[in-house]
């Protein structure tokens, strides 16, 4: 194995977020309010199963332990189950997760688990069916809830649920969410709304700091847990009276980037050192043949020397991120 991926600030990278499509069938207000529009960058289409196999093999050799498949909506790819199986071929990768809108969860989750999937994140921004419809543009609330139930039925011990925290939309619904997870092993993760190139007006209107929820959770006796090295950025809280957990993802908080442990590869094969970074490093020309792995690993390692200390979101920098489907959120 090559040496562990480490940047100039001594941060080690165990976690790859791999986008496999930027297509999505939902129209969430904070991401794709006008629906998916092809960007014109699909010169070769999205990464193939073989290309995904090669890029994840290289990252595994460089110390990656966890791969999250993202989009867009990953399950819209007809070969999604094959993609899971291809990533699973790497023994060094202990966790394979997906972030999904839950649209096909009920139908396909058993097949995904059989292929090697170990973790599921489902986006649910409201537990009110009408508000869910208003946020996503899809009247699929009951279908998504059935999908979460199906995940438990096929053997997943925990499901993570992502909720984008929005002022005057869902920030006042904490009690409703807590009731939902009291007897369910769901890690409910409130994610602060982030400003993107296309979402500045929405950000100004609806952003609220996750510190508001953190203060309330601590007041109610919730306990902050320690992070593991391949965990995502959430601050996780537990309570003895609840089967579920609460996670808070607060990218505007001081020192948020100090524990960064993840890199991103886009659906067209570009390595992004930060969700809000500039440009990206092309890897696709080194994904054509198995004999290119050493050169691929060298390019990834060299690129990491350019990773900045912080995302500079607090300075109103949004980089090239037009919307969160662009490189997988």
Swiss-Prot record:
SMART domains: Elp3. Binds 2 [4Fe-4S] clusters. Binds 1 [4Fe-4S] cluster coordinated with 3 cysteines and an exchangeable S-adenosyl-L-methionine and 1 [4Fe-4S] cluster coordinated with 3 cysteines and the GTP-derived substrate. It catalyses: GTP + AH2 + S-adenosyl-L-methionine = (8S)-3',8-cyclo-7,8-dihydroguanosine 5'-triphosphate + 5'-deoxyadenosine + L-methionine + A + H(+). [4Fe-4S] cluster 1 binds at residues 24, 28, 31. GO terms for molecular function: 4 iron, 4 sulfur cluster binding; cyclic pyranopterin monophosphate synthase activity; GTP 3',8'-cyclase activity; GTP binding; metal ion binding; S-adenosyl-L-methionine binding. GO terms for biological process: Mo-molybdopterin cofactor biosynthetic process. The keyword Secreted does not apply. Its EC number is 4.1.99.22. GTP binds at residues 17, 68, 99, 160, 262-264. Belongs to the radical SAM superfamily. MoaA family. Catalyzes the cyclization of GTP to (8S)-3',8-cyclo-7,8-dihydroguanosine 5'-triphosphate. This is GTP 3',8-cyclase. It comes from Shigella sonnei (strain Ss046).
């Amino acid at each position: 194995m090559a040496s562990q991926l480490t940047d100039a600030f001594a941060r080690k990278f165990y976690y790859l977020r791999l986008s496999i499509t930027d297509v999505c069938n939902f129209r969430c207000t904070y991401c794709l309010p006008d629906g998916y529009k092809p960007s014109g960058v699909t010169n070769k289409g999205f990464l193939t199963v073989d290309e995904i196999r090669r890029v994840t093999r290289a990252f595994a050799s460089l110390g990656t332990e966890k791969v999250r498949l993202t989009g867009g909506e990953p399950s819209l790819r007809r070969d999604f189950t094959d993609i899971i199986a291809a990533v699973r071929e790497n023994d060094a990768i202990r966790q394979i997760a997906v972030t999904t809108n839950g649209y096909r969860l009920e139908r396909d989750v058993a097949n995904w688990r059989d292929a090697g999937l170990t973790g599921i994140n489902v986006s649910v921004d409201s537990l009110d069916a009408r508000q869910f419809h208003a946020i996503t543009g899809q009247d699929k609330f009951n279908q998504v809830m059935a999908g979460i139930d199906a995940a438990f039925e096929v053997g997943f011990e925990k499901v993570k649920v992502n909720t984008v925290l929005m002022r005057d939309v869902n920030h006042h619904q904490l009690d409703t969410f807590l009731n939902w997870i009291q007897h369910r092993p769901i890690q409910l993760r409130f994610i602060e709304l982030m400003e993107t190139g296309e979402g500045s007006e929405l950000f100004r209107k609806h952003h609220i700091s996750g510190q508001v929820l953190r203060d309330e959770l601590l007041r109610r006796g919730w306990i902050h847990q320690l992070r593991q090295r391949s965990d995502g950025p959430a601050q996780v809280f537990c309570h003895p009276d609840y089967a579920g957990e609460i996670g808070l993802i607060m990218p505007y908080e001081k020192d948020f980037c100090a524990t960064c442990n993840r890199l991103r590869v886009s659906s067209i094969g570009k390595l992004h050192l930060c969700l809000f970074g500039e440009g990206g490093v092309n890897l696709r020309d080194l994904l054509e043949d198995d004999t290119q792995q050493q050169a691929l690993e060298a390019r990834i390692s060299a690129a990491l020397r350019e990773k900045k200390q912080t995302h500079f979101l607090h300075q109103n920098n949004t980089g090239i991120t037009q919307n969160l489907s662009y490189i997988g959120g």
